[in-house]
Amino acid sequence: MTERKQGRRSAQAAEETKLLIMKTAAKMFCEQGYERVSLRNISEQAGVSHSLIRHHFGSKEKIWHNISDCLHVYFLSYMYKLQESIPADLPSNLILYRFITMLLAQQLVHQQPIQLITDGIRQGDELMDYFFDSNGELEEFVNQLVDTFHRDFPEAELSVWEMKWQMMIFANGAVNLKPFLIETWKHDNASYSQCLLNHWELFNRNMAMRLNVTEEEMLHPETLEDILIELPCEWGCDVQESS
């Protein structure tokens, strides 16, 4: 019995160490870029030995793969929970509208995932091929919502790829063009969080127009946090951007 308990504690300690390494690496990839971060840098920052990192992951690329896998799991969980929070008896255009706009709010507040994706693009095809090859479930999930919308609104022209592209532009622009975002609303003395809300409203109105959502049906939160779904990320991808 004692050996079994010790085994469980050892397994738990190993898992906690892996999460610490991933959390540390993800933060460093966002701040410095994947290319500039070495295993030794991660080792020093995480306070674990270089050999232990190699034992758990083998290479820096494998750490990125593990982070990417966790991102997919988290996004899928978030999307399911988000869908559950939207009343099922709403018209399909409102369900899709709320889903898309609330999902962008999550990406604007919790910016680490989009930072990692952007940095992965800079590193070339190898990292991004892995990311894109892993997201079949995410594609299927979004496609089901769009297919239902098209069934109920056959006259509407909505491309799921264009919709995803717009979401990527809005998420990426706010995160990686932060000085320009702040400059846009500097005459209002807006905080960064208010700038993010203003930025989100541009997307919000665009999607409402595309999905035939009236002004009365639209979401107009006082803060983006008001429309977030609470779902902790075990390795810290839900860290909130400071205002």
Task: Indicate residue ranges for each PLM-predicted region.
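Hydrophobic alpha-helical connector segments
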Residues: 66, 80-113, 152-155, 160-164
